[in-house]
A protein has these predicted regions:
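A short alpha-helical cap/connector motif
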Residues: 1-220
């Protein structure tokens, strides 16, 4: 029997209120705008009954994955992957706006080229419910292939550029289990990220889905 619409609405409202509270808890540890942050949590909740790790590629201060941990609970393994040295150089494939961004420290989203410290990420995770946390420092091409070969329930990509996004997809996407999810932060913002996702999804014949301004892929 279908769930009555009013029950669905009440459940959504309850989650929305809770997720906004989670945003307030971590807002100093994330660059993501409140609506997008809450949207990420709504999507993350869809994998609540899917077993596997949570991996974030491009974690900055850890505020997004910490919020996800509060939604998905303490029993999973959470991996925070970042250079903690800022973004690598943008390439031609990333587009003119990306090249302009990386030389413009007046941009409100610049944050020293997206540089954060491991301690800031640990601080965010210490406030979360997560018990099993791994901080993985280094460039994706040097670190992602070294992660333990465990199933992934949720893979979140926030690497901005083509090469970073492509590396994460080629290295980790095949380990995302059925009904698991890939969330892509920059799909509607950076050309290179869009291209990397489109290429990989086409190769796999995976439909690209959208919730507001959030791009995601649900693994068949």
């Amino acid at each position: 029997m279908p769930i009555p619409t009013f029950v669905q609405a009440a459940r959504f409202a309850t989650n929305e209120f809770r997720f906004r509270q989670i945003y307030q808890k971590y807002k100093t540890h994330t660059m993501i705008d409140p609506a997008l942050y809450v949207g990420n949590l709504h999507l993350a909740k869809r994998v609540a009954n899917v077993e596997g790790a949570v991996i974030e590629c491009g974690t900055w201060r850890g505020g997004m994955i910490a919020g996800i941990a509060d939604v998905l609970g303490p029993e999973r393994h959470y991996y925070l992957c970042d250079s903690f040295e800022g973004l690598p150089a943008a390439e031609q494939v990333d587009g003119a706006n990306a090249k302009k961004y990386e030389v413009d420290p007046t941009n409100p989203w610049y944050h020293n080229n997206c540089t954060a410290s491991e301690d800031e990420a640990r601080e965010a995770m210490a406030k979360s419910t997560a018990k099993n946390v791994s901080i993985v420092k280094g460039w994706f091409e040097n670190t992602l292939a070294t992660l333990p070969q465990e199933p992934i329930a949720l893979l979140r990509l926030d690497g901005d550029w083509y090469s970073s996004t492509k590396c994460a997809l080629e290295t980790l996407a095949d380990r995302v289990v059925s009904r698991g999810m890939i969330l892509i932060d920059d799909y509607y913002f950076w050309e290179g990220c869009t291209m990397a996702v489109n290429e990989y999804a086409a190769q796999k014949k995976w439909p690209i889905q959208q919730l507001g301004k959030i791009c995601y892929i649900t693994i068949p």
